[in-house]
Each structure stands twice: as C-alpha cells, then as structure tokens.
Amino acid sequence: MKSHKSVRLISGIVILSVVFTLASTAGPVMAADKEEAQGIVDKAKVTLEEFLRDKNYSWVNEHINKEKGVLIYPQVLKAGFILGGSGGTGVFLARNAKGEWSQPAFYTMGSVSFGLQIGGEAAEVIVLCMNQKAVDALMTSKVKFGGDTSIALGPVGAGAKSNVVADFVSFAKSKGLYAGLNLDGSVVDVREGLNQAYYGKSLTPIQIVVEKKATNPGSSALRAALKKAK
C-alpha cells in the first residue's frame, strides 16, 4: 500500500511540476509573440509608405482606397535551399462600404519558389484584393493564388495605367527596385498564433476583420497610413 501511495504522490508532484512549468513559460512566450506581431504591423506601415511614395508604384496609391482589401508583407524571403522554398508573414486589412479599414489579421505566404526576376533574396510585397471574391477567399480558408482565385502582376512605372482583370493584383520591390515576383501557385494561410497573441484571445479572420470582435491600438498608425492614400 505504501508503494502505491508513493507512486501516486510522485505522479502528483510530476503533474504539478509540469503545470507550473507551463504556467511560468506561457507568459513570456505570449509576450514574445505579441512583440513579433506588433513588429510586423509596424514594418507593414513602413512598407506601405515606401510603395506610396514611389512614383513607379503610383497605381497602388491611386487604387488602394478603391479596392476591397490589401495584404502587406514587409519581407518575403527566398530561402535558396530545399527546392528554393520561400515565404514570409504579413497582415491583411479589409475596407468596408464606408471606406474604413479593419484591424489587421496575420497571414503567412509560402511557395516552392517565387523566382525573383532580379535575383534578390528578399522582397517587400503588396497584394490588392480587387473584389469581394478575393476577400471571401481569405476569410474562409487558405488561398492558393492561381487556383480558385486569379492573380496578376500590377502595372509599374510613373503614370502607369491599366485595367487589370484578376482577383488579386501584386506588387513587389527588392532593395528599393522593381522585383517581378511571380506569386502564382503560392499559398496564403492564417497565422493563428499571432492573431491570438496580438488580440489576447483566439479569433478567426472574420471575427477580426468583419465582426470587429477585438481591437489593438498598435494598428492605428498602419490604418492611418492606408487612409492617407489617394
């Protein structure tokens, strides 16, 4: 009987130790994730402003406040190994009928190979959502560009004019220069952990973007920058 009691006692101590360990590490991990999330939002603002200032991307400036939403990736890395895998994390914001921009939801983007035309290893990327179909696709599941939704490279150059017909239109630059980044075949998926860290609770993109179940004042500068576009 004593041996059984000893086993139960030891088991209880082990379980309590695990619980206390998890409790002690959960806070720092969540704080780190929140810091990472805010960093992505801040960098997204910088990326957006760089595109808006660049005359070669005047089409972005002229259309961003006319379209349904935008994906902003401050850095998409080309790994250069294992089939040239590439990817990055960014934010998605949608614009409602009143012209108001939503809170950001976090999304990853990955591809076997993006094939940067200028041979760079990293790029800043903006993808405009041209219709409701594009927004709905991001709200419901992971999206494969060129699958159920179409994507096209956006017009580049001072005074560029073009009637692009696609669900998504992408723009990319690397080291301040045009990067003909082909996103066809790449996959965009929700970064659930960062969404939870940024808003303090588990939320779906619909709850963040459409239902406005949470806010974070850290996104105000990014949203203001979007509003300033022509």
Regions found by a protein language model. Give the residues of each.
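N-terminal secretory signal peptides that target proteins for export/translocation
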Residues: 1-8
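Sec/Tat signal peptide C-region and signal peptidase I cleavage site
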Residues: 24-31
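Bacterial N-terminal signal peptides
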Residues: 12-24
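Small-residue-enriched, tightly packed secondary-structure blocks
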Residues: 31-230
